[in-house]
Each structure stands twice: as structure tokens, then as C-alpha cells.
Amino acid sequence: MRINQPDEVFILTPGPIERLGGMERFLQYVARGFEQRGFGVRVFHSENTGPRFWRHPNSKRKLEWLLAGSLHGYYIGRAAREALHSGVRLVLSNSTVGWYPLNGVKRAQYFHGTYRGQAEAIRPFIKHQGYMKLKWWDAMVLERFSGKNTIALCCSETIRAEIYRYFGYDAHVIWYPLDIDHFRPLDMKSCREKLKLNAGPVGLFVGSISPTKGFPVVEQIARENPQLTMLVAVRGPLPEGIHSLQNVRTIQDAGYELLPTLYNAADFSLSPSRYDAFSFVVAEALSCGTPVIASPHGASLTFYAEPPLEQLLTASTDDVEGFRRAVRNVLSNPQRWRAVIEEKVRPRLKQMMAPENWWRRFAGVVGL
């Protein structure tokens, strides 16, 4: 190992952190926060380590796909080991790429959920092979060993319970950091004018159409409420059925700067996820004062623990009547619900997720 090097933090993650996504958003916050505190940051991922052939495996070639999941962790870990020096204060990994042995350095594994929990939640919607891979290979082998002999971190009490149940690790709940000055209440009328929205109620969905996100609920609410303008901000392709709905306006790959405008233009946001460790889009919407109608998952269970907020929580993703009832409830008095969110949720969210508070908690847990 080299000596007399400046303090650095290594981040080990499956792909580039510049992409859209909750895990990537978290790592962008963390990398920027380390740099602001005087640390150098190096990010090791599948596209800057290892042979090009293994960077984008063909999911239709099952053996290649399976091997790539293991080899990403090997090449990422090997590159990190070769770069280690005496100034590396922490190696922070996540997902399935933190299992490579790195001796003599402090390590932490951040669990953004578990693949085991995700596999169980979406089992009816994926092939048996995919379920078995998620449950046994990704979760019980790669993810479990990625957390072994590290400081285990996670984003909610729900996920802490999963980690202990499946892996036997006692994780620290540290939530996520969130820029609450960026995601703040804005003038609804101005936001709607920017988006050129018609008069009338506005709903919102931000996310993807993967099986975990419960997108059919969004389609159904839009179809049953033609008077409602439904904003749908998604990553990736849209299902064909959505194009036939005249009251749906789609925004693909919405940028970070646009998100507060979207949240503040809406009377409510929908989060019907089957599995969500702690959804950034829920926290972002709530930080803007926007009520989120949600199935039970990490973020909704965290913030909707007291009256009248439980009225925004459905029994499950499949509780369509619960979503209908909550939509009617919010639209009957949208300003009242905004006031409830700003009074009861935003102060707690600030305490948990404001960057200065989050960093104090994180630094204490990992010993920096």
C-alpha cells in the first residue's frame, strides 16, 4: 500500500452514479457531501473496471447473465484493492458488488432494500428462474456476503428488519439525505403555468413501470377520473395502454431541476409500489408539501404513523378501492391536505433527512 496519500473514500456500486434512480441519487448526495468535507472520492463500477465484454451482459443468455453478476463484484473489488492506500478512510459499497475481500480498511455496506424481499414481493410477475436468481444468488450469496464483516447501513426500519431476518446482520437505520431547500413548497399556480396545465385537479406519478412500482394502479386512477390531469414522469418506456388516455401527460426522464415543479403542480402523488425500501420520490413530494397516496412500504410507513395521515395509506398495492377513496379524500380539500403535510411531515423529514442532520448521523455510525 502507498503512504502519505490524501484522505479518500471509495464507493463500490454496480453502475455509474450519474444515472437516474434512487440508489444513484443517494450516491450523488454522498459523493458530493464527502467532497465538501475535504475527502477525495473514487467511484468503482462495472463500466470503469474489468473487460468490456462483461459490462453489458445479454439477459437472454442465462449463463452469461449469471456470471456477469459475480464478475462485476470481482472486477470492481479488485480495482479498489489495487488502488488502496493509507489515506482511504472508508469503502462504501451497496447491492451485490461489495463481497470482494479488502483487508485493513474500514468498510460499510448500504442496503437499499434486499433482493430477497424484492423477489418475494414481485414473485407473481417474474419467471421462476428470475425469482430463484434474485432470491438465492443475488440475495443469499452476493448481497449477504457483501454485508459480511462490514458496518451494515440501511434506509428504513422495514429494511432493517429484512436484513436481520434474511442475513442475521444488525443494521443501522440512517435514512437518506435530501436537499430540502431544493424540494420545498412552491406556488402551485406558477408551477402549473410553467407546465401549461389546464384548470382542474392534477395527479402525479414519478418512477418507472417495473413490476415493483405498481403502475397499473396509476393507469386505473387516470382512466376512472377523466376530469383529472395525470402527470406521468417515468424512466424508460411506457406501456402501450397509457397512450389511449387523453388525460395523461407523459414526461420521460425528468431532470432534477424539473422535479420540484412537478411535485408542486400536483394535488397528490401516487406511490403504489409492491416493494420500496424508502422511496426518494415519496420523500421529495412530501418535502414539497404534496400529499402522497401510497401502499405500505419504507417511506409511507415511516411518515404516516399518526392521524389523519393514515388516510393516505392503502392496505396494499392491490387495494384499488383504497386508492380511489384516498384520491377522493384529497381532492375534496387539497389545500387542507397540503397544510397537514407541511405541519406534520415536513418537520420530521427535515430532522431525519436534511443534509447537516443526516451527515452527523452517518459520520457517527461509521466513525469518520
Locate each region found by the language model.
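Membrane-proximal helix-turn-helix segments that form the acceptor-binding/catalytic region
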Residues: 130-152
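Acidic anion/phosphate-binding donor-loop and adjacent secondary structure
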Residues: 178-194
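Short alpha-helical donor nucleotide-sugar binding micro-motif in glycosyltransferases
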Residues: 261-266
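A charged, aromatic-enriched C-terminal amphipathic alpha-helix characteristic of glycosyltransferases
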Residues: 318, 332-366
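Aromatic "clamp/platform" in nucleotide-sugar-dependent glycosyltransferases that forms part
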Residues: 274
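Nucleotide-activated donor-binding/catalytic signature segment of Leloir-type glycosyltransferases, i.e.
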Residues: 239-257
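Short hydrophobic beta-strand element within catalytic cores of glycosyltransferases
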Residues: 291-294
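Carbohydrate-associated surface elements
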Residues: 158, 177
